[in-house]
């Protein structure tokens, strides 16, 4: 019996360790997402999948969306992140996102989808200067 309990304890510890590792990895993932979203220039949009690919996680577009739900990231220009077909996000945010993008000069189709071919952000073409804090100090 004690061997079984010891085995259960061991699995519980492994489970907790795996959860901690996943939480650390997710925090790093979210921080990478936030860094990219912060660099999307006005008048340009990026897709959830594009952001996921930029951080080397091409199958995690949905998790880019989850990252937007974190209150710590609400100061970021999430209105510049759209679906791959140019559709705007959810009903609660749709009109606000539409007005914000329109005020930045983004053009839409008749059914209010971003003209993605014309306004999708290309980081190489639309380079945004990095903050001096992004560079390590070298002595």
For the regions a protein language model found, what residue spans apply to each?
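Tryptophan (W) side chains
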Residues: 10-11
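Nucleic acid-binding interface residues in structured DNA/RNA-binding domains
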Residues: 23-139
